[in-house]
Structures are given as structure tokens and as C-alpha cells.
């Protein structure tokens, strides 16, 4: 997520997607950055504007059983469901005048929501940059690939954490690597057939112990498939047992280091969290969480589906108290201790394959 708003990446996105910018959005962007800066200086949360980047969860259902994912491994305790199109549109109507980017995933497989392409199209028509992440199992026909392209989706991540079925299924439990390969091929061909530049296709490879030797071959597969980017990402774990099983032996591909206190995220402790100023997480039922690391919405800020409510939520007591707490001592929040946001390190690396 962070690389999208990094200083090196942002100018490229501004040039490519000039359509998403307006004076109102630019003013909001500047307001957010200024309030963030002031907050860091005075050590007290000041909030101007609203988040310029939104994360929206279309569904928290998933077809796979990935062992490190709360949705797949069954550890997620919150109710499951799909975001309704009506609630979604009302939320977009309220927030799109000032926000310019929508990351359309969280827990679950977005394309299990049958309205997903229509959701993307609605956001696109509102001038939002749209981005999603998928396990690639629902691009089964040429018509489905064309629907994705025609929706106006700007960018898509397709997860492919292996080069053969034996390796792939060790993490993507219940998945079929050939379906993913075929789906990516269909999407590349659909773009060519329709003469479309988007969506840009990212092939994502999460590095784990069982696949760490396949990175170069996976990149070659990405080139052969004709995708736009190859994304290498480190794995997030939640227990020592998971660490022993999944973290790569090659230290440069791990986001953690071992200490006397156990596993900790590499790098110097980070003060505060900028995400709490520029982004917000809206789950399928409208529950607003501070970010995507709050898997079970333990820190519910309010409901985005109550008409005109988001402005009050964004500056409400719950959000402000949480910002104050994180600004004072980020390590005091459990989920923040396992978060790489703001740290300098190789947590993800994007290689451009096509200009």
C-alpha cells in the first residue's frame, strides 16, 4: 500500500491518471498533508480534510484457505457478508469529491461479490483511481476478462506465490495455479483486444520458506505472461509456529528479525502512523476501522453507511483518541507492533516490466 503514495511513485501516477485530480481534491490533499505535519510537530492530532485514499472491502468471503489469512484460516471472528451496491454508491457519493484513490479489497476475494465490476465502474465514473487484489480464480471466461477491462479498473494485483501446483498449494490452499495462469492470460488478451491500457496487471509473489528459490522463475513467468509489473512481497506472520513454517531462511526476504522479546518488524521504531491521516478502512457492512491491519474491527470508529456520517466519524472522539494513542506510543497497540507501515525496509518491491 505504502509504495503507491511514496515520493518516487506518486509523480508517475499523477502523470498517468491526471483525470482523477480536481481543485477540490488537490486542496484536500494539501490540507491532509499540512495537518499531518502539524500533528507531528506539536505531538497532538490535528485533522484537516478527509482521507484522500480509501480502502473498501467488497466482501470478506474467500474461496481459498490461506493459512496466514484470518479469512482463510477461520480465525476472523466478525460476521461475513457482501457490501450492497446501494450502500456502496451512497458512500462513494459522499466521499468521492475529496478522495481520489480507492483500494477495493481487504479480507476476502473481491470477485465473489457479484456487483464488484459495477462497483468499480461507479467509482471510475466518479473520477476515482481504482485498484484491487485477487487470487485470480474468477477470470474463467473471455467475457469475464472483458468485463474487468470495461469496468474501468486502473490496476489489479494477481497473487501467484509459486511456479507449479505443488509449491503454490502449500499456501494458496484449495487453489489451482493453472486457473490463475489462464485468468492472467485472458486478462492480457482482453486488454489487447479492446485496445485498453488498463488495468495495469501486477503479478504478486509473497516470499515464503517453500518458494524462496522460485523468485527469478516467477519473474520470468510474469514477463512471459505479458503483465505490467512483478511485485515481490514479504510475508506477515502472527505466531512463532507460523514463523518457523513460513518465513524464508533468506533474511533479506523477511520483514522480521529475532530478538529476546521474539519476532519484531525490522527497522527503528516508528513514531505515529501517517495512515491515520490519509486513509480509512470501510468494511463490507460499513464498519469503519483505522486501517486494514484491524482484521476484526477491534477499533470500530463508526458506520460509513449512515448518511453524511463520515465527516463526523473522521473527526470524532474514537478516531481522535486512537490517533493520539498511536502518536504517543505506537508500540502500545497490538496490531501496530506487527505492521510495517512507515518502516524502511524491503517489505515489498515492485519491478516495472512494461512502460
Residue ranges and their predicted role:
Residues 53, 202, 300, 335-338:
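Generic structural signal for residues positioned in beta-strands
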Residues 63-71, 290-293, 334-342:
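Local cysteine-cluster metal-coordination motifs and their immediate loop/turn environment
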Residues 31-51, 303-324:
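Short, charged low-complexity linear segments at domain edges
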Residues 3-155, 170, 174-178, 182, ...:
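Conserved alpha-helical substructure of the radical SAM core
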Residues 56, 60-63, 267, 330-333:
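Processing junctions and N-termini across compartments
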Residues 1-16, 78-86, 126-129, 147-312, ...:
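Radical SAM enzyme [4Fe-4S]-AdoMet core and its adjacent flexible, acidic
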Residues 52, 275-276, 332:
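Short, basic and Ser/Thr-rich N-terminal targeting/leader segments
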Amino acid at each position: 500500500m505504502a509504495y503507491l503514495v511514496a515520493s518516487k511513485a506518486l509523480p508517475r501516477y499523477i502523470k498517468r491518471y491526471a483525470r482523477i485530480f480536481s481543485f477540490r481534491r488537490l486542496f484536500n490533499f494539501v490540507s491532509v498533508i499540512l495537518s499531518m505535519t502539524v500533528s507531528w510537530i506539536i505531538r497532538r492530532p490535528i485533522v484537516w480534510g478527509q482521507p484522500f485514499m480509501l480502502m473498501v472491502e467488497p466482501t470478506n468471503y474467500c474461496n481459498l484457505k490461506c493459512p496466514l489469512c484470518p479469512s482463510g484460516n477461520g480465525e476472523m471472528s466478525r460476521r461475513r457478508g457482501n457490501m450492497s451496491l446501494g450502500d456502496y454508491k451512497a458512500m462513494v457519493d459522499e466521499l468521492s469529491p475529496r478522495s481520489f484513490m480507492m483500494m477495493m479489497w481487504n479480507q476476502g476475494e473481491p470477485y465473489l461479490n457479484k456487483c464488484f465490476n459495477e462497483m468499480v465502474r461507479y467509482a471510475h465514473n466518479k473520477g476515482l483511481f481504482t485498484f484491487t487484489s485477487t487470487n485470480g480464480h474468477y477470470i474463467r471466461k473471455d467475457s469475464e476478462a472483458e468485463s474487468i477491462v470495461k469496468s474501468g479498473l486502473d490496476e489489479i494485483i494477481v497473487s501467484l506465490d509459486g511456479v507449479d501446483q505443488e509449491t503454490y498449494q502449500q499456501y494458496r490452499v484449495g487453489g489451482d495455479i493453472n486457473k490463475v495462469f489462464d485468468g492472467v492470460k485472458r486478462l492480457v488478451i482482453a486488454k489487447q483486444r479492446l485496445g485498453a491500457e488498463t488495468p495495469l496487471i501486477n503479478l504478486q509473489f509473497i516470499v515464503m520458506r517453500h518458494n524462496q528459490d522460485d523468485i527469478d522463475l516467477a519473474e520470468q513467468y510474469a514477463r512471459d505472461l505479458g503483465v505490467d509489473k512483478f511485485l515481490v512481497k514479504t510475508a506477515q506472520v502472527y505466531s512463532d509456529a507460523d514463523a518457523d513454517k513460513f518465513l524464508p531462511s533468506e533474511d533479506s526476504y523477511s520483514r522480521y528479525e529475532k530478538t529476546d522479546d521474539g519476532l519484531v518488524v525490522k527497522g527503528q521504531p516508528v513514531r505515529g502512523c501517517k495512515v491515520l491521516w490519509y486513509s480509512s478502512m470501510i468494511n463490507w457492512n460499513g464498519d469503519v476501522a483505522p486501517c486494514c491491519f484491524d482484521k476484526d474491527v477491534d477499533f470500530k470508529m463508526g458506520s460509513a453507511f449512515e448518511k453524511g456520517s463520515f465527516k463526523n466519524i473522521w473527526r470524532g472522539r474514537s478516531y481522535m483518541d486512537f490517533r493520539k494513542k498511536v502518536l504517543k506510543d505506537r508500540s502500545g497497540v497490538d496490531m501496530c507492533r506487527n505492521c510495517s507501515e512507515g518502516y524502511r525496509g524491503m517489505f515489498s518491491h515492485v519491478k516495472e516490466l512494461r512502460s
